[in-house]
Amino acid sequence: MKTKNRLLNSDIDFVNESIPYSRSDFNNMLTKLSSNDYYQLMVNTYIGTYGSAKFFGESTKTLPENFNWKTITEFDPPSIVSKKKLISEPENQYLCGNCWAMSTVQTIGDRFVVAGLVNWVPDLSTTFAMLYYPQGQCDGGNSAKLMRQIHTGIGLASKHCIDYSWCSRNIECKTDNSLGHFVSENKSYLLPSKKGCYYNSKHYIYKIDSRPKIISGYGTLNTDNEVLNNQILLKQEILANGPAVGGFLVFENFTSAFTKVNGGVYLENVSNYGSGKPVEFNPHINKYSGNHVVSILGWGVAKGIKISNTQFSDVPYWFCRNTWGKNWGDKGYFKIAMYPFNKKSQFLKLVSIVDHEGHTRRNSGVVICNVSETPILQSLPVIPSTEIPKSLDNSTNFYSQDENYEIKNNSQNEKGFPKGNRRRTTSSDTQIVFIFFLSVVILFIFIIL
């Protein structure tokens, strides 16, 4: 039983499972950023300063200083607002070390939303991914490898097929300690042993177009200039196509406390987060806990925050969604300083460190995937009733709702995005329409007579 110093995802290697972000990807992204909605967002954000710019790809100055797929602002055009309302909220992995799966499936679902392929919250199933593409399950895994397997495999189903009840309703897995999975025993034995859904029903299958694309981490350690260029590229990619998956080193000071002080931005060299005192810095104080994978939803700049014991500065950060529940951090979200303010705990520069056992650990990297096809409704295997948790997160009806979702053609909306958060067509809806039509006919006959 492993109960101490379990270094999850201790050597995340996105490189061998991905292909480089290509010139074609770059051109497609710039084409999307030149659309009217993004132009409107840019002009409103920088009115009077960069109003003459044609589109985001022309200059780094045309990117908004702050943007993320969670926060709705007064500058967002209606289509962007509609999509932001459908972006996944933070989930909780509890004592299962599956950030590699949970962050990946949520990010993929978000990309279906941003692409305008669904008009509901996808709620893709982490459990489905862990059963069909297991890797280490609760003992860690590789997000890029998972994306590759999803591309070549059946795809992904939502929580309407199978949800996280096996963990969230089990005292052996559920916890209030967000960092508990780093030292807990491997909880993979709690998972259902069979692939499939809880009940016999049709479910949407979500597929990705190709192997994952790596934005950073391809080849050897990046130079500083490459890192800065990749920061611009990642911002453009997130804005155009949705959140990305990022891996980074976690140190012992990465606790919920940092989100409450000093602009709420995580800086790796702070030694006293949570002490109630002004932040203090010590570059040698923090120990390595493991590697972590999260969803990168956007970026921003924290103005005039403390960066050393004697200095203050504006600090650019990535806005991220964690997998440690809504009671952690800023309701499940956090800001992490970009390179070079963080040199080790960051996304875009590959780093190697020596852990407390003398092992070299290598991490950092960002991967994305392309989506272009609407989900397809199909029947899936059903797991034995003995495999269904005794207590479920949702009512029985929840596990058949995929059949009631209707994918609307984007052309029905002049903004290119379906109206409404969720669209269902049920037998009761049909009955209402029929009764209304029949009433009109009877009234018409009565008037004629």
From Swiss-Prot:
It is found in: Membrane. It comes from the Viruses. It is a single-pass membrane protein. The keyword Signal does not apply. Its main location: membrane. The active site is at C99, H292, N322. Belongs to the peptidase C1 family. Probable cysteine protease. This is Probable cysteine proteinase 224L. It comes from Invertebrate iridescent virus 6.
